[in-house]
């Protein structure tokens, strides 16, 4: 688990387990290791990123989607757009590292279906909803605002295309 908010001397300000940041970190670190192509770093860090993905799968993957976070041990079951996008890539990445672990590929496919069913706003020309309740009901938030843009979902699409092309 990563810490996410700090004071000026790097003390954690809040007891927050950010599931989205952890799954995002798992694949971004692996991508960085791929680019660096340094076996020493890969040997040290690849097992850690695998553990992160496994922990997120076990702790936060519920009903074909990833919960938002846990503050002081209490889960926020909201499903946030960027977390679902990062989860698709993170679980594909975990499957690519361990092709025998079909649960990760199945989870990535299930999260994609969840996104299509609940997060994609069906109105023509629209975007993904910011977030939905655990039951898939959209929560009223702007479709686009300073913290909500197609960065994560766009990157997810590009990563999935790249990774599936590499796999074939």
Show where each model-derived region lies.
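Glycan-recognition and catalytic cores of secretory/periplasmic carbohydrate-active enzymes
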Residues: 1-168
């Amino acid at each position: 688990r990563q810490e996410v908010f700090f004071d000026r001397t790097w003390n954690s300000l809040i007891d927050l387990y950010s599931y989205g940041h952890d799954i995002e970190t798992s694949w971004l670190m692996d991508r960085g290791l791929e680019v660096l192509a340094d076996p020493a770093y890969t040997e040290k860090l690849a097992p850690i990123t695998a553990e992160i993905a496994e922990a997120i799968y076990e702790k936060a993957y519920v009903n074909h989607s990833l919960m938002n976070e846990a503050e002081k041990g209490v889960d926020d079951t909201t499903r946030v757009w960027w977390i679902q996008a990062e989860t698709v890539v993170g679980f594909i990445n975990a499957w690519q590292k361990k092709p025998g672990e079909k649960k990760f590929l199945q989870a990535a496919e299930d999260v994609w279906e969840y996104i299509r069913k609940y997060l994609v706003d069906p109105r023509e020309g629209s975007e993904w909803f910011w977030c939905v309740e655990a039951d898939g009901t959209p929560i009223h938030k702007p479709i686009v605002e300073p913290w909500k843009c197609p960065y994560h979902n766009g990157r997810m699409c590009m990563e999935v295309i790249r990774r599936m092309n590499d796999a074939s």
